């Protein structure tokens, strides 16, 4: 029988890990409010995570952030007016944590600053996510787990979408996630 990966403490003491054998055990409390502060090479943004409507996705993101999974990872795909995609430690768009998890019903419309999971089809979520940065992203069909909203630092999302990119939408100057810190409140 497979065991889930144990859920780490949120105090920054968890080891740095980027590969796992199993998806994480459920370790968040959906009655609490979770916030992610994502510090990037362009500045910091604060993201309210939606543990009520996307508990499995928030659990996964918090688990990975607690393991410093996203530290030093780039946004590898940026399309102005659409979205900024990151969360792949290989920086290629093909990497992930070593497991996949199921989709959750999208209960709210995407808006600029929405945080959602990137996927390769139904139930293929892992570590990659995107931030909606423009009208093309707002119009996406509800097939990407929507699990957060930027509540401070939308100007960072806007600056990110405006970086110069190559023909494959890869930023010519890397946009790096320095760290993701999780806060919990009642």
Predicted regions and their residues:
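Cyclophilin-like peptidyl-prolyl cis-trans isomerases
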Residues: 1-186
């Amino acid at each position: 029988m497979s065991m889930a990966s144990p859920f780490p403490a949120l105090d920054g003491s968890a080891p740095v890990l980027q590969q796992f054998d199993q998806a994480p055990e459920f370790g968040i409390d959906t009655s609490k409010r979770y916030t992610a502060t994502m510090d990037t090479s362009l500045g910091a943004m604060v993201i309210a995570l939606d543990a009520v409507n996307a508990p499995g996705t928030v659990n996964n993101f918090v688990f990975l952030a607690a393991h410093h999974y996203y530290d030093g990872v780039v946004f590898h795909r940026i399309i102005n007016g659409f979205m900024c995609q990151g969360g792949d430690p290989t920086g290629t768009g093909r990497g992930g944590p070593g497991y996949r998890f199921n989709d959750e019903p999208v209960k709210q419309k995407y808006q600029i600053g929405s945080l959602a999971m990137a996927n390769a089809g139904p139930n293929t979520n892992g570590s990659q996510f995107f931030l909606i940065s423009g009208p093309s992203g707002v119009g996406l069909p509800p097939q990407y787990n929507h699990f957060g909203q930027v509540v401070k630092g939308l100007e960072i999302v806007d600056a990110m979408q405006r970086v110069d990119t190559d023909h494959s939408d890869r930023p010519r100057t890397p946009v790096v996630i320095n760290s993701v810190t999780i806060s919990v409140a009642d």
